[in-house]
Curated annotation (Swiss-Prot):
Region described as Involved in Mg(2+) ion dislocation from EF-Tu: spans on this chain: 82-85
Domain of life: Bacteria
Keywords carried by this UniProt record: Cytoplasm, Elongation factor, Protein biosynthesis
Localization: Cytoplasm
Protein's recorded name: Elongation factor Ts
Length: 348
């Protein structure tokens, strides 16, 4: 078996919450492939949806800057080596200066930033001077420039998460749309959607999660059954992308058959079936609520979705772009081999 180490087992446990032996077996079955082991556990109903936060190891700050008329915004991730430096006033000011430079000069990404000039000198020369002053290696790792009819953003007070959104709308409601986008950006910083709409979800991902979510609920039902508590419905689907007209029609026909079998008068079916259809859709779109921004319960009022909250402000508002940075996302932890490091330093 390739690469099945105690460290890997520990990491899989932290990612999924599954038991040690279950994690070990899953890694053995997948030849040490962490991602495949996570999916194997989920499909067996043994692990929760994994977040790859365990692989994140970076310090620094996320910065968001929006221009005065809410038509452009820059999102920047500036990394340092330690949290101590990230809280340093010089580092905070540096982050603001780079973000302002990017916004004022229409710099769209980190590569363009690296080749730009700031305060009359090459960006890397400028950054090297700051490195010498601050005393740690610094990296402007990610940068995005967002433009649109209306744009707004939010950065969490800790500087570890930032979100920028763009939308189209009627000119008359632009100010309302800008205020709404800030609130939705705040929502997205906490709820971590990966796409704007369920329509943006990859079909292969939907199919994979269909099995995994069913397995999760079946595992929960085993425990509820043991405790003598009501069990959850097992969904047929997990996303609106799977809910064809035929699927909804089949559900409606099934509800009609059930009401008929229960002896309910046909004249009251019209009062009952719409609620059943609504519940059917909610039960069968759980994936959308996890990953699609518009389908998520709105944190400002969880009785409505983000999509419904937008419609209440004005039906002309349409979100067209969504970018979320989380500090260190995608950076792998460095595994230290202290024996090898000592041997290297001793020239062995």
């Amino acid at each position: 078996m390739a690469g099945v180490t105690p460290q890997l087992i520990k990491e899989l446990r932290e990612m999924t919450g599954a038991g040690m032996m279950d994690c070990k077996n899953a890694l053995n079955e997948t030849n040490g492939d962490l991602d495949k082991a996570v999916q194997a556990l989920r499909e067996a109903g043994l692990g929760k949806a994994a977040k790859k936060a365990g692989n994140v190891a970076a310090e620094g700050l996320i910065s968001v800057l929006v221009n005065s008329d809410n038509t452009k915004a820059v999102l920047l991730e500036l990394n340092s080596q330690t949290d101590f430096v990230a809280k340093n006033e010089n580092f905070v000011n540096l982050t603001k200066e780079i973000t302002t430079h990017a916004l004022n000069n229409g710099i769209a990404d980190a590569q363009t930033l690296a080749s730009s000039k700031i305060n009359g000198e090459e960006f890397q020369t400028y950054l090297n001077e700051k490195i010498a002053t601050i005393g740690e290696n610094l990296v402007a790792r990610k940068l995005s420039l967002v433009s649109g009819q209306v744009v707004n953003g939010y950065v969490h007070a800790t500087g570890r998460v930032g979100v920028v959104l763009a939308a189209t709308c009627n000119d008359a409601v632009k100010d309302k749309a800008a205020a709404l986008l800030r609130n939705i950006a705040m929502h997205a910083s906490a709820m971590k959607p990966t796409v704007i709409s369920y329509k943006d979800l990859d079909p292969a991902f939907v199919e994979s999660e269909n099995k995994a979510i069913r397995a999760e609920i079946e595992a929960e039902n085993d425990e509820l059954r043991r405790l003598g508590k009501p069990q959850k419905r097992i969904p047929e689907f997990v996303s609106k992308s799977q809910l064809t007209d035929e699927a909804i029609a089949a559900a409606k026909a099934r509800f009609e058959d059930e009401l008929k079998a229960q002896g309910k008068p046909e004249k009251i079916w019209a009062n009952i079936i719409p609620g059943q259809i609504e519940r059917f859709i909610a039960d069968n779109t759980q994936l959308d609520g996890r990953f699609a921004l518009l389908s998520q319960p709105y944190v400002m009022d969880d009785k409505k979705t983000v999509e419904q909250a937008i419609a209440e402000v004005d039906s002309s508002i349409v979100i067209t772009e969504y970018i979320r940075f989380e500090l260190g996302e995608g950076i792998e932890k460095k595994e230290e081999d202290f024996a090898a490091e000592v041997a290297k330093q001793m020239g062995k």
